[in-house]
Amino acid sequence: MNSFTRIGLRSRFLLVLMIGLILPTLSVWGQNATITGKVVDPKGEPLVGVSVLEQGTTNGTVTDMNGRYSIVVQKDSSPLRFSYMGFDNQEIVPGKRRVIDVTLTENSVVIDDVVVIAYGTKKRRDMIGSVSKIKSDEMSLMQGGRFENSLQGLASGVQVVNDGMPGSTPQIKIRGIGSIASGSDPLWVVDGIVGGGSTMVNSNDIESIEVLKDAAATAIYGSRGANGVIIVTTKKGKKGGLKFDVHYEGGITPITNSDLGLASTKTYFNIMDEARANVGLNPLDPQKDIIEPYYSNWTSPITREEAMNTDMDWVDLVTRMGHFHDINVALNQGGENSTTYASVNYRSDESSLKGLSMNAVSARLNSEFKKGIVTLGTQSFLKFDRKKSTNKWAVVSDKFPWRKVYDPEDPTGYWNPQMADGHPTATLDNDYQLSTGENFSFRTTLYMDVNLKWIKGLSVRADASYGYGLAQSDYWLSGLITNTGNVDGNQGNKSKKTTKSQQYHAFAKYNREWTDHGLDIVTGIEANRSYTDNAVVAGKNLSGEFQEPKIIGTMLGNNSAYIGGESYTFSFFNRIDYKFKQRYLLGASFVREGSSKFVKENRFGDFYSVSGGWIISDEAFMRNAGFISLLKLRGSYGETGNQNIPSEVTKNSYSIKSKQYYNNMQNMFLWNIANKAAKWEKNKSIDLGLDYALFNNKVNGSIAYYRRTTSDMLMRVQFPASAGSPNSGGNADNNSMWANVGS
């Protein structure tokens, strides 16, 4: 009996143990499940490479050549997300289903995407002008870099040149150079306000960027649109509760080409020996002859044999591993009648070239309030940055590999301190040549939109903007690294530039569509005032070794200067777009603009554009071409102007001579002879393009041909000495042809 009891207890124990082992397995089997299926388009064709992801995990797969997939989900309650380029995403909760077939719907955004244009918006398929759009998520791929760099890769016909200096503004060219001497930079429009450039934008605040390239798109901006237009739309608040977004990005910035192939000491002397032989000179004795004959201005008494003991890599001495940090905090809040977006950004850059650095802080506030037919809004942005730089790259470029960094036998501690460029590491370590700059920028805009409901499609808008900028810079050059015989000693200068701008818009928009017709009209006025005040004081033979010349009283002298002035523009603009049966497109714009930079007779210029488009893919004879989603032919002709010249071109201007003549008296001379004939520089452009989208919008792009001719070009013409003035404004012609393919 006792034996039976023991056996029974043992059996029960084994049974409990087996149940304990099996139940977790059953539980896991109940959670993990294999889901299979097929993904097709609306026509039933299989889609290859569709991403299938279990939400909340990293568990995912893609469809095969037949559009089929298989995935083991961890929880059958977790949604499966199906995503594919050109189609809307779809989420499905498996539940108890183990076979899930999915039909993805085409994403119409590619074709019906709304682009921002001058004083309004338009569907991409209805665009006749040449416009490229870049969204914020596309720019986010350019991590660590400036957002301007993404324009070159994402907008066809755009060139971006960046010198790599921390905080520097890249040079941007749209379809080449349109003006030789009067500026070729495009016009920046941020939230409808002209001017400010890319420095007035924090890349984290950008919602989208539109690049306007041809006259059909830019003519309405008059003179300022001659070199293309870049429209930046910043983020606005969205309905919902208070949301915070914190973003940090950091990284290293190594020198892009550290191996410059600089000659070693041995290679240098071999080249010099060959050079002497080529001109018929006798070879030198490495043990007796000093190095001076190799370089006529060099005074070192050492021989080649002594020099061969040194092989210095000067590039390595002045470079480092650069790094950057970018911190952005954004706030988003919105209700039924009001929305707010605010952000603060801090960025620091240490260049891969020693001595170059930048620190910047910026902030933005966008607020909007709606009540009935009226919308009121404000947009404000401010930025402060501090930069430090020294000119050392030019110093390194001509330093010999046999030159020592430090020579204890030399009274100054290093070779030839009298050279014009000085000693690179001594300059670095002691800030003997230093440039510092501080910049503050501020812009605020108040706008009001009114939708006039009693006239369907009619709305009016008025806005006023004020901008302020302050740029201060200091430069210091120690007397230790000036040329031999130079009696200027310590040198320095200090500059202060103040800019102010005011801008006003008032315009009306009418947008209406009937059965077979569509009409979009914009008409309005714009007024601008800009003011500049720039003062520079400079001095030489300064006492002490202060690197930032703060005691400006000791520096005043003949090298001081002041430049200032103000200018005004006023324009009346109009644009009309018409479409018939959603596929025949016509457009025209006209602008009359006046500038205070020209004399009364040439003050006003008239600029216009005409354009047309044909959406061929909507025709009946194209309906059987199923692989073509969009095929649009477009063309335009237009004329824009340029008045980007100094205000004194049409006036006589004088300058003070730095040297004193005529009985030691200060004298003045005529610096610029007034050119009363100066008038608007004109750019005439022709643009022909073919826009396409294929295979359910999976492939899209454009092919374009354009030609731009510039006449009445504004540029400086050098005068002979007998004229008594060095220069005056003149005219020239520039013709160019370009071809472009983008996708």
Language model: regions and residue ranges:
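Extracellular/periplasmic, surface-exposed regions of secreted and cell-surface proteins
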Residues: 139, 184-185, 191, 360, ...
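A short beta-to-alpha transition loop/helix N-cap that caps and shapes the active-site region
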Residues: 253-257, 385-389, 642-643
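Short, conserved phosphate-binding/catalytic loop or strand-edge motifs used
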Residues: 168-169, 479, 483
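Flexible glycine-rich, low-complexity coil/linker segments exposed to the extracellular/periplasmic environment
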Residues: 263, 267-313, 403-429, 547-559, ...
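Short, small/polar-rich motifs associated with maturation and membrane association
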Residues: 1-364, 370, 375-377, 416, ...
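Conserved protein kinase catalytic core
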Residues: 124, 197, 219-220, 351, ...
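Flexible, solvent-exposed loop segments that connect beta-strands
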Residues: 304-308, 482-488
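N-terminal processing/targeting junctions
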Residues: 21-23, 383, 407
